C-alpha cells in the first residue's frame, strides 16, 4: 500500500493504490463491529499486529453456504477468557486478573465498566455458552476498550463517563486543529508580507529564481471543526493532528484540507491515517476504511479507543518520532476572521485551480497524476484508464508536490487537459473544478483588461479563463519564454530537475506546446538559461498576443465561429434553452453573476453563496460518476497515440482538445477524413512535438464549426418536417419525400478508436416518429472542449417508454406510414446525400457495438437483419423504399459485404410482395366478414339490419394497417412464422368481429328482459384459463418478445390480440371473448426505464380498456366492451381461491360465472388485505353492482365503494388504482368498513345476515 521514497530523493514520497470500498448499502454494521472488535482484542492480547499468528489475522471464515463464522481457534480463546486476560496484562500489567471469566467480570465491575446485553448484564454463563454468544463477548470487548481508554487518558480533565471521555478526546483533536490553523495562517501572513511592494520592484535589482512558495497566499487550507465523531469521517482532522505531533512523518502538503470534502478526498486522508497508525501505534488501526468513512454508531467505542491510543502516544509515551510543532498556546481557539471564511470554504469548490493531490479521475476524464520532487511521471492517463476498468483504479500517485506547476490550455474548463496544479497546502482533490474565482492577492498586479473579481463574485466563463491564464505567468522566471514551465525544487539550484522528454522542448513558445495532443511539463535543462528575478517579485502577465493562450480563449476574433466556453456543469441548462432557439442559435448559458459585489454585501449573502457552491460541488461529483461510466463504456477509445506518427491535419485535432474516440462531433469526418483519434497522454518517452501556428488552430475550429452548423441545419429541417407531420389530422399535409439523415462517423485508421457504444448505440434506437424532444442543440459556436460530446447523440436518444409519450398515442393507423417516411442513415465517412428512392442501408461498424448493444439481440440470427426500421406500405397500399440495418465489419472482404446487402434487399422485396398478396387476401376477407356480420345481425329479433353491418365494418378497417405491420415480422422467421401468423390472424379477426357485433347487439336486446339477460348471443365453445406461462413459451413470445424490447420495432403483431391463437396451433386453450395479458410480449411498460404505474399502462391486461392495439411505431389504448371473465377466472384460480382447500368454493363461483350473461365481473374484498368475499356483476347502465356469489351487500352503489383494484395476470396479484370511478378496467373493489357486520354468516350462500 505504501512505498517509501529512495534515499536522497528529497521530500517524503508515498504511493497509494486507490482502494475499492463497499458502498453504504452493502456495508454490514454488525459484521464490521465484530471484525473491528476481534481485531483489536487480538492485537491487544498478542502485543501488536505483527505478533498476531497468521491464522488469526482474519478471524472469520466462510463455509460452503457462503455464511461467515468465527474461526474455531478464536472461539476457543474467547470461551476460555484467556484472550481478555492477555489483553489486560499487555495494557494494564499492574492490575492483572486471574484467567477466568468471573474474575474478569469482577475486575471490570470494580473499574466501573460493566459489560451488559440489552436484557441484562453479561454473566459468566453467557461467556461460556456454546455455541458462542457473540453479543456477550462483544460487550466484554467494549468494556475492555473503555477501561483502557480511561487508563490512557488520565491526564485529560473532566469526569470519567463515556460520553465525557468521547467529548474530551474530540475537544483535544479540535483544539490541536485550531492551533495548527493559527500557525498556518501566521506563516502564510509572514510569507505574504515581503511580497507587498511588488509594483515598486525594480528590474535592475539582483534577482533570484522565483519559487512556488510565493503563491501561498492565493488560497489557504480549510481546517474542519470537530464536535462529533462524524466529523472525523473526512480524515482531515485526524491527519492534521498527526501532522501537529509528527510533522516529519506526515507533511501538511499531503493532507487534503478543503470544504466540502468528497468521498474520494476522505478516502485519501483516511489512507494517510491508516498508514501512520499501522506503522507507529502499538496496536495499529484495526478499523477498515469503511469503518472510518461511515462512522457507524456500533463502532463508536472502537473510534474512541483509537483516539485514546493516539493521545497516549502523542502526549504520554512520546516516542522519538513524536516531535510536536511549536504551536501557539490556544486552548481558547480564536474564531476565523470573516475575511478568511469565504476563501476557505469556497476554495474547494469555486477555484479554477486544480490540485493533483487525489488519486481519482476527474469529472472530465482521466488526468495525469503528476507528483514527486523529481517531477517523475508515474503513469499515463490513458493506460491508467484501461487499468481502471478492473476492480479498482491502479493509479500510482506520488506526493507531496512541493514544486507545484501551473499550466493551462486553450480549452474549456471541462476539458481533459485543463489542469492547473496549485499550492502545496491547498486543496488536494481534482473534484474542485468550479468556475469561481481564486482568492484574490491583494498586492499582485494584473492586466488592466482583466480585473480580479472580488471575493465571492462568480465570474463568467471568459473571465474565469482570463483569471487562469493571467495567473500563470506569475510563476515564470524573469526572461523565460512565454510557455516555459519550471519546477522549483526545495533544495535550490544545486540539482537540475529531470525532464520527462528531451530538453529542447523547454524553450518552445507556449502556443507551440500547449496546442499539441500530449501536454507535458517540461523542465529547463540548464537553470542558468533564465535570468533570475528579485526576491518577492511576481512577474506581470504579458499582454494578449497571438501566441498567448489567453488570446485564443477570450478574444472574440480568435476564429470566425466565436468560440464560447461553457463548463460541463452548464450543459444541462442548455437543454432547456435549446428548444427555444432555431437555426444556428448559440446557447450561452453561463452563470449570471453581478459585475462586482458591493462592500455592503451582507454575511447572509456570503453564506448562501457557500451553500450554492457546495451544491454545485455535489452536482459535479455526480457528473464525474457519469463521466467515468461513459469512459468505461468507451474503453476502446482510449488508445495511446504517439504524436510522432501524426502530422499535418492530425495536429489540428490535437488543438481541439484531443477528443477521445467515440466522442468526436458528428460532422468532423466530413471535412477532414484523415484526422486520427488521439487521447491526452503523459508518457515520458515521447519525443518533442513540432510547432504549429495559431492560424491552423483557427482554421480547424472553423471547419468543425461549419460542419456542425451544416448538421444543425439538417436537424432543423428534419424537425420542421416532424412539426408539419404533427399537424391536426383533419388537414394533413402531403407526405414529404424520404429525407436521409446522415450521421457520418469518424474516419477509421490504424490508430483510430472505435466510437463509444454509449454514444453510437442509442442513435440506432431512435424511433422514426416525431417526438417532443427539444430543438437539436448543436451549438454554432462550437468550442473545442464541447467537441468531445457528439450533439446528435443526445437528440437521437429516445426515452425507452414509448407508451408514456402523449403524441405516440393519438394518431390513427393510417397516419403512421406518412409520419415515418424520414429514414436514418448512419454511415462511415460519407457526405450527406440527396434523398433517393432506392433502399437505404444503415451501416454501423461492428467495432462500435459494444456489449450493451449486443445484449439487445434476442437470438443468434445475423445481427440486425430482422430488426428493421421499415414499414411496408402507406394507407393507400403503395410500397415505400426498404430500410434496414446492416452492420459493417471492417475485417470482412467486400464481396461478403455485397452478399449480405443482396440478401437483405431480397428479403425486403419478399416482404413487399407478401404485403401486396396479403392486401388482396384481406379485401376478400372483408367481403366475407361483411356477409357474416349481416347474417348474424338478422338472427337478432327486432333489430335494424343496417346497424350491425356498419358497426362491423369499423373493426375490420382497423385491421388493415395491423396486417401491413405484420408482414415484415413474418418474413423474419421463415414459413413457420408466416403460417402461424396467418392462422392466428384468421381466428383473431373472426373473434374480434363477433365481440364487437355482440357489443352492439346486447344493449338493445337487454331492453326486453332483465339487466344483462335479454338478447343472448350465440354460445361459443368454452375456453380454458389463459395460461401466461404457456403464452411465454409460444412462438409469439420467443420470436417477438426480444423484438418488442426495441423502441424502433415496427413489424410486430397486434399486441391486443396476439394471444388469440387457434387451439390447435399452440396446444393452449385461448379465451374467445377477451384477449389475455400481452405483458409477456414486452409491452412498453415493461421496457427498461419504464416509470408507469400498473394502473397507467396496458401491460397486465386486467381489463378491456387497458389492452393496447399495436399499429406500428405508435401505441395507443382503445377501450372496448370485451369481457373480463377469464381475468376473473385467472384471479380466482391463482390468487383469491387458490389451492385445494378453496377448490369447492372456486368451482361453485366459476359455475355462476358461466351461467351469467354479464360482461364485467368484479370481486369484493373484505379490506385492503384482498380477502375474497363475493363476486359481483357490473351493470353498464346504472353502474350498480349486483351480487352473483359469495356474501356481501346484494347491491353496491358507487357511493359505497372504498377502493378499486386491478388484477395483473402476469404477476398474479391485485394492484390498487388511485381512483373511485367504476369502469371496465376494474377487477375488484372494497366497500366501506362500517357496512360489514361484526358477526360473519356461517355459509357464503346465506344472504340473510349480510348488510343491505
UniProtKB/Swiss-Prot annotation:
GO terms for molecular function: actin filament binding; calmodulin binding; microtubule minus-end binding; spectrin binding. Residues 335-353, 374-383, 441-450, 525-534, 812-825 have a biased composition (Polar residues). One of its GO terms (biological process) is regulation of focal adhesion assembly. Residues 729-739 have a biased composition (Pro residues). Residues 183-205, 331-385, 429-457, 479-604, 638-697, 712-935, 962-981, 996-1030, 1063-1114 are annotated as: Disordered. PANTHER family: CALMODULIN-REGULATED SPECTRIN-ASSOCIATED PROTEIN 3, PATRONIN. This is Calmodulin-regulated spectrin-associated protein 3. It comes from Mus musculus (Mouse).
Amino acid at each position: 500500500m505504501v512505498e517509501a521514497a529512495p534515499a536522497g530523493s528529497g521530500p517524503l514520497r508515498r504511493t497509494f493504490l486507490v482502494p475499492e470500498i463497499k458502498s453504504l448499502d452493502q456495508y454490514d454494521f454488525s459484521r464490521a463491529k465484530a471484525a473491528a472488535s476481534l481485531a483489536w482484542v487480538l492485537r491487544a492480547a498478542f502485543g501488536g499486529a505483527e505478533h498476531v499468528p497468521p491464522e488469526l489475522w482474519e478471524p472469520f471464515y466462510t463455509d460452503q453456504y457462503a455464511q461467515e463464522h468465527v474461526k474455531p481457534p478464536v472461539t476457543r480463546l474467547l470461551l476460555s477468557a484467556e484472550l481478555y486476560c492477555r489483553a489486560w496484562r499487555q495494557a494494564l500489567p499492574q492490575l492483572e486478573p486471574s484467567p477466568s471469566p468471573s474474575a474478569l467480570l469482577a475486575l471490570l465491575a470494580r473499574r466501573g465498566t460493566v459489560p451488559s446485553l440489552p436484557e441484562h448484564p453479561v454473566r459468566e454463563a453467557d461467556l461460556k455458552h456454546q455455541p458462542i454468544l457473540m453479543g456477550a463477548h462483544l460487550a466484554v470487548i467494549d468494556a475492555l476498550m473503555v477501561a483502557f481508554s480511561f487508563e490512557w487518558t488520565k491526564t485529560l480533565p473532566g469526569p470519567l463517563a463515556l460520553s465525557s471521555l468521547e467529548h474530551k478526546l474530540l475537544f483535544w483533536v479540535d483544539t490541536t486543529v485550531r492551533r495548527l490553523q493559527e500557525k498556518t495562517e501566521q506563516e502564510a501572513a509572514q510569507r505574504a508580507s515581503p511580497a507587498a511592494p511588488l509594483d515598486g520592484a525594480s528590474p535592475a535589482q539582483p534577482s533570484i529564481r522565483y519559487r512556488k512558495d510565493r503563491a501561498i497566499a492565493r488560497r489557504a487550507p480549510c481546517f474542519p471543526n470537530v464536535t462529533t465523531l462524524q466529523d472525523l469521517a473526512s480524515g482531515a482532522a485526524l491527519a492534521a493532528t498527526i501532522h501537529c505531533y509528527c510533522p516529519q512523518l506526515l507533511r501538511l502538503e499531503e493532507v487534503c484540507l478543503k470544504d466540502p470534502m468528497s468521498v474520494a478526498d476522505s478516502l485519501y486522508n483516511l489512507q494517510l491515517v491508516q498508514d501512520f497508525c499501522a506503522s507507529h501505534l502499538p496496536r495499529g488501526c484495526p478499523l477498515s476504511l469503511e469503518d472510518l468513512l461511515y462512522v457507524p454508531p456500533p463502532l463508536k467505542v472502537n473510534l474512541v479507543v483509537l483516539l485514546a491510543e493516539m493521545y497516549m502516544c502523542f502526549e504520554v509515551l512520546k516516542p522519538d518520532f513524536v516531535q510536536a510543532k511549536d504551536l501557539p498556546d490556544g486552548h481558547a481557539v480564536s474564531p476565523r476572521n470573516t475575511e478568511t471564511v469565504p476563501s476557505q470554504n469556497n476554495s474547494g469548490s469555486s477555484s479554477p485551480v486544480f490540485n493533483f493531490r487525489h488519486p481519482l479521475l476527474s469529472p472530465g476524464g482521466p488526468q495525469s497524476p503528476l507528483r514527486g520532487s523529481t517531477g517523475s511521471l508515474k503513469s499515463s492517463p490513458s493506460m491508467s484508464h484501461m487499468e481502471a476498468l478492473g476492480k479498482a483504479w491502479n493509479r500510482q500517485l506520488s506526493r507531496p508536490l512541493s514544486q507545484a506547476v501551473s499550466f493551462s490550455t486553450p480549452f474549456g474548463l471541462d476539458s481533459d487537459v485543463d489542469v492547473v496544479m496549485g499550492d502545496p497546502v491547498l486543496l488536494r482533490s481534482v473534484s474542485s473544478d468550479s468556475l469561481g474565482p481564486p482568492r484574490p492577492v491583494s498586492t499582485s498586479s494584473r492586466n488592466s483588461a482583466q480585473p480580479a473579481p472580488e471575493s465571492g463574485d462568480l465570474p463568467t466563463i471568459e473571465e474565469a479563463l482570463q483569471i487562469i491564464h493571467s495567473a500563470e505567468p506569475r510563476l515564470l522566471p524573469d526572461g523565460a519564454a512565454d510557455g516555459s514551465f519550471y519546477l522549483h525544487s526545495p533544495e535550490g539550484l544545486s540539482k537540475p530537475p529531470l525532464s520527462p522528454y528531451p530538453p529542447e522542448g523547454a524553450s518552445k513558445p507556449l502556443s507551440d506546446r500547449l496546442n499539441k495532443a500530449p501536454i507535458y511539463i517540461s523542465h529547463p535543462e540548464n537553470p542558468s538559461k533564465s535570468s533570475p528575478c528579485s526576491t518577492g517579485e511576481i512577474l506581470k502577465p504579458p499582454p494578449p498576443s497571438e501566441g498567448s493562450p489567453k488570446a485564443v480563449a477570450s478574444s472574440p476574433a480568435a476564429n470566425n465561429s466565436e468560440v464560447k466556453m461553457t463548463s460541463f456543469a452548464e450543459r444541462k441548462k442548455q437543454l432547456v434553452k435549446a428548444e427555444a432557439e432555431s437555426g444556428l442559435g448559440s446557447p450561452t448559458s453561463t452563470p449570471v453573476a453581478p459585475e462586482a459585489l458591493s462592500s455592503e454585501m451582507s454575511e447572509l449573502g456570503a453564506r448562501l453563496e457557500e451553500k450554492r457552491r457546495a451544491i454545485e460541488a455535489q452536482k459535479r461529483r455526480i457528473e464525474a460518476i457519469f463521466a467515468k461510466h461513459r469512459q468505461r463504456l468507451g474503453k476502446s477509445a482510449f488508445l495511446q497515440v504517439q504524436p510522432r506518427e501524426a502530422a499535418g491535419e492530425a495536429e489540428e485535432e490535437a488543438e481541439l482538445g484531443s477528443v477521445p474516440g467515440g466522442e468526436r462531433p458528428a460532422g468532423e469526418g466530413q471535412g477532414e477524413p484523415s484526422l486520427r483519434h488521439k487521447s491526452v497522454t503523459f508518457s515520458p518517452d515521447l519525443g518533442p512535438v513540432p510547432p504549429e501556428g495559431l492560424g491552423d488552430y483557427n482554421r480547424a475550429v472553423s471547419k468543425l464549426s461549419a460542419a456542425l452548423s451544416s448538421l444543425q441545419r439538417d436537424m432543423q429541417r428534419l424537425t420542421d418536417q416532424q412539426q408539419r407531420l404533427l399537424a391536426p389530422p383533419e388537414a394533413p399535409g402531403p407526405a414529404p419525400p424520404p429525407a436521409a439523415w446522415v450521421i457520418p462517423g469518424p474516419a477509421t485508421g490504424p490508430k483510430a478508436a472505435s466510437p463509444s457504444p454509449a454514444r453510437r448505440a442509442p442513435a440506432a434506437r431512435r424511433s422514426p416518429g416525431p417526438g417532443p424532444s427539444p430543438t437539436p442543440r448543436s451549438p454554432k459556436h462550437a468550442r473545442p472542449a464541447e467537441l468531445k460530446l457528439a450533439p446528435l447523440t443526445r437528440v437521437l436518444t429516445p426515452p425507452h417508454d414509448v407508451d408514456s409519450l402523449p403524441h405516440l398515442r393519438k394518431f390513427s393507423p393510417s397516419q403512421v406510414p406518412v409520419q415515418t417516411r424520414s429514414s436514418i442513415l448512419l454511415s462511415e465517412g460519407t457526405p450527406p446525400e440527396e434523398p433517393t428512392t432506392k433502399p437505404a442501408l444503415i451501416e454501423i461498424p461492428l467495432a462500435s457495438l459494444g456489449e450493451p448493444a449486443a445484449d439487445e439481440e434476442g437470438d443468434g440470427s445475423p445481427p440486425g437483419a430482422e430488426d428493421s426500421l421499415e414499414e411496408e406500405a402507406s394507407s393507400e397500399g403503395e410500397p415505400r423504399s426498404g430500410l434496414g440495418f446492416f452492420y459493417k465489419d471492417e475485417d470482412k472482404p467486400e464481396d461478403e459485404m455485397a452478399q449480405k446487402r443482396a440478401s437483405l434487399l431480397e428479403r425486403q422485396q419478399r416482404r413487399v410482395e407478401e404485403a401486396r398478396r396479403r392486401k388482396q387476401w384481406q379485401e376478400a376477407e372483408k367481403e366475407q366478414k361483411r356477409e357474416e356480420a349481416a347474417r348474424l345481425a338478422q338472427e337478432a329479433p327486432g333489430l335494424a339490419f343496417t346497424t350491425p353491418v356498419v358497426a362491423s365494418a369499423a373493426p375490420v378497417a382497423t385491421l388493415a394497417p395491423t396486417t401491413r405491420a405484420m408482414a415484415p415480422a413474418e418474413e423474419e422467421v421463415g414459413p413457420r412464422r408466416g403460417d402461424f401468423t396467418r392462422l392466428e390472424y384468421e381466428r383473431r379477426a373472426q373473434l374480434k368481429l363477433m365481440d364487437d357485433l355482440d357489443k352492439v347487439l346486447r344493449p338493445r336486446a337487454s331492453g326486453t328482459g332483465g339487466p344483462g339477460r335479454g338478447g343472448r348471443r350465440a354460445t361459443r365453445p368454452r375456453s380454458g384459463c389463459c395460461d401466461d406461462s404457456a403464452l411465454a413459451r409460444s412462438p409469439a413470445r420467443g420470436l417477438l418478445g426480444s423484438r418488442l424490447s426495441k423502441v424502433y420495432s415496427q413489424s410486430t403483431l397486434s399486441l391486443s390480440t396476439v394471444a388469440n391463437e387457434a387451439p390447435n396451433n399452440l396446444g393452449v386453450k385461448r379465451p374467445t371473448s377477451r384477449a389475455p395479458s400481452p405483458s409477456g410480449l414486452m409491452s412498453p411498460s415493461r421496457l427498461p426505464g419504464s416509470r408507469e404505474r400498473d394502473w397507467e399502462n396496458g401491460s397486465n391486461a386486467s381489463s378491456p380498456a387497458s389492452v393496447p392495439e399495436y399499429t406500428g411505431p405508435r401505441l395507443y389504448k382503445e377501450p372496448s366492451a370485451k369481457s373480463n371473465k377469464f381475468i376473473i377466472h385467472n384471479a380466482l384460480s391463482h390468487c383469491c381461491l387458490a389451492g385445494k382447500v378453496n377448490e369447492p368454493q372456486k368451482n361453485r363461483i366459476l359455475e355462476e360465472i358461466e351461467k351469467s350473461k354479464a360482461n364485467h365481473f368484479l370481486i369484493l374484498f373484505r379490506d385492503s388485505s384482498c380477502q375474497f368475499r363475493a363476486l359481483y356483476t357490473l351493470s353498464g347502465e346504472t353502474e350498480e353492482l349486483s351480487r352473483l356469489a359469495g356474501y356481501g351487500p346484494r347491491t353496491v352503489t358507487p357511493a359505497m365503494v372504498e377502493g378499486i383494484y386491478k388484477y395483473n395476470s402476469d404477476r398474479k396479484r391485485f394492484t390498487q388504482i388511485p381512483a373511485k370511478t367504476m369502469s371496465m378496467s376494474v377487477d375488484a373493489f372494497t366497500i366501506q368498513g362500517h357496512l360489514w357486520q361484526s358477526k360473519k354468516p356461517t355459509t357464503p350462500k346465506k344472504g340473510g345476515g349480510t348488510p343491505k
